[in-house]
């Protein structure tokens, strides 16, 4: 496995760029690492405000499960997908997701964060958004790996599919009021991300 060695894509000349042409959307890690960092700080602040009563949590789902979901399926998913969509470009030689496609994926991720905080009881809408985010990312990563016949990396698709299942099961559990079961799926997701980290560590 070759080390990650990216050539920075930059505009060929200075001009007024449309949003999908911004350097921010030329590589997957750029928007997702930025958003993951910002969200990790904001989510912790919101959690602190909920704990001390500054913010009133009105949803039926326990705030602890909102916090767990956002740290695991919000923050961690952004880091994982941002990294994989970028690193796979080196592993496969296939261009990673960029431009309008990357903007759409980022918009889905942001929408899911907003839905869960402002409309936490609408678990069905959040479920659709989260599944769409995972499937979009998995589909493009699969395209990169299959196009290059990078069979030894197919395991990553399997792990991401498991994380999609855990995320969906978590949201279905909260929708049905099975909060103990939802906590179980957060624990399984943590193990899933640990497995993904171990696999990536063996690649780089």
Where are these regions (language model features)?
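Hydrophobic alpha-helical transmembrane segments of multi-pass integral membrane proteins
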Residues: 1-204
């Amino acid at each position: 496995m070759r080390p990650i060695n990216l050539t920075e894509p930059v505009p060929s000349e200075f001009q007024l760029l449309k949003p999908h042409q911004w350097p921010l959307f030329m590589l997957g890690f750029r928007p997702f690492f930025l958003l993951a960092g910002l969200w990790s700080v904001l989510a912790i602040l919101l959690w602190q405000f909920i704990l001390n009563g500054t913010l009133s949590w009105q949803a039926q789902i326990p705030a602890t499960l909102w916090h767990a979901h956002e740290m695991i399926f919000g923050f961690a998913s952004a880091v994982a997908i941002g990294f994989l969509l970028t690193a796979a470009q080196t592993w496969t030689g296939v261009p990673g997701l960029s431009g309008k496609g990357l903007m759409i994926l980022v918009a889905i991720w942001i929408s899911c964060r907003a839905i869960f905080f402002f409309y936490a009881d609408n678990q069905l809408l959040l479920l659709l958004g989260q599944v769409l985010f995972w499937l979009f990312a998995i589909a493009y990563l699969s395209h990169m790996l299959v196009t290059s016949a990078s069979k030894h990396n197919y395991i990553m698709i399997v792990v991401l599919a498991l994380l999609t299942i855990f995320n969906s099961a978590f949201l279905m559990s909260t929708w049905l009021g099975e909060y103990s079961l939802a906590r179980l799926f957060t624990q399984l997701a943590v193990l899933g991300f640990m497995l993904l980290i171990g696999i990536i560590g063996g690649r780089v």
